[in-house]
Amino acid sequence: MSRIRSRNTGPEMTVRRELYHRGFRYRLNRKDLPGTPDIVLNKYHTVIFVNGCFWHGHEGCTKYVRPSSNVSFWEAKVKANRSRDAKVTAHLEALGWYVITVWECELSPSRFLSTMDEVEASLRANRFRFLSDKASEKRRREAGSILRKRKRADVLSKEKSSLSGHRIPKTVRSLSDSSEE
């Protein structure tokens, strides 16, 4: 296991090469994100994990075969990997990132182009969703700002009406009126 790399694996390099060929630009292994995603596309607010079928326990895959020796160790290891993958995915989604998982078996020559077409379609859809989410968030902020301004104006008008019975020097009143504008 000491020779197993966590970065720059063959499947990861294949996906990266194809993404670059299709015009996508990305960052690698961002440590500030949970799980240190293999590929991060900031513009699309999307992360891509390229998982090996054996190490991450891809169910129903021919490349995931449980070893016959030391069965309890391998079952625990694969179970822990699956659990960690689920937690990392949930955490990233909670932070607003879109998560794509590409399995090693999906990169076989017969399935490679269709897999990468699906990844590209997901990226483009994520970009659209991210921009629409961003725009709706901006509209929510603006609406909240308008409501806060209205409340502030109501409070100031109530204060003025409650203070109208008191004698307020003209200089103070003029300063108060100019600060509202």
Question: What is the predicted role of each segment?
Answer:
Residues M1-T101, C105-E181:
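Nucleic-acid endo/exonuclease domains
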